[in-house]
Amino acid sequence: MRNEMNLTFSALSQNESFARVTVAAFIAQLDPTLDELTEIKTVVSEAVTNSIIHGYDGNPDGKVHIEVTLDDHVVYLTIRDEGMGITDLEEARQPLFTTKPDLERSGMGFTIMENFMDDVMIDSSPEMGTTIRLTKHLSKSKALCN
């Protein structure tokens, strides 16, 4: 069965936990393992934080958009902003790379996403924003909704 959810919120750091919990609650209907749920929550947190901190540089007027699609035992996540975009995507995907060392950012966001998800696609254009598409195949999915 296919099920979808869309969520849009202001680019405020306090909304990161709201996004993480909302996505986890929606995905729970597939009965993921605790590890799978934790990995998805972590990835949502990383992507949303990137949008807020890097995409909008802390500008609360920006919006973060999340789309979640559940299709049988597969979770598809899209996290998008219309912020600054990424000028060098290859460099940004390198472990420990950060544009904000003064904020003590670890530069591991994309690395974490790539390790926890089955597929990660990033589209970004300077001054146009960034879209991250993530796919996760759940191991013991027993969809609870009919």
From Swiss-Prot:
Signal peptide stretch: none
Keyword annotations from UniProtKB, A to Z: ATP-binding, Kinase, Nucleotide-binding, Serine/threonine-protein kinase, Sporulation, Transferase
Gene Ontology molecular function: ATP binding; protein serine kinase activity; protein serine/threonine kinase activity; sigma factor antagonist activity
Keyword Methyltransferase attached: no
A Pfam family this chain is assigned to: HATPase_c_2
Catalytic reactions on record: L-seryl-[protein] + ATP = O-phospho-L-seryl-[protein] + ADP + H(+); L-threonyl-[protein] + ATP = O-phospho-L-threonyl-[protein] + ADP + H(+)
EC class: transferase
Residue spans crossing the bilayer: none
GO biological process terms on file: asexual sporulation; negative regulation of sporulation resulting in formation of a cellular spore; sporulation resulting in formation of a cellular spore
Enzyme Commission number(s) from the entry: 2.7.11.1
Family membership: Belongs to the anti-sigma-factor family.
HAMAP family xref list: Anti_sigma_F
Chain's role: Binds to sigma F and blocks its ability to form an RNA polymerase holoenzyme (E-sigma F). Phosphorylates SpoIIAA on a serine residue. This phosphorylation may enable SpoIIAA to act as an anti-anti-sigma factor that counteracts SpoIIAB and thus releases sigma F from inhibition.
Name of the featured protein: Anti-sigma F factor
Species whose genome carries this gene: Bacillus pumilus (strain SAFR-032)
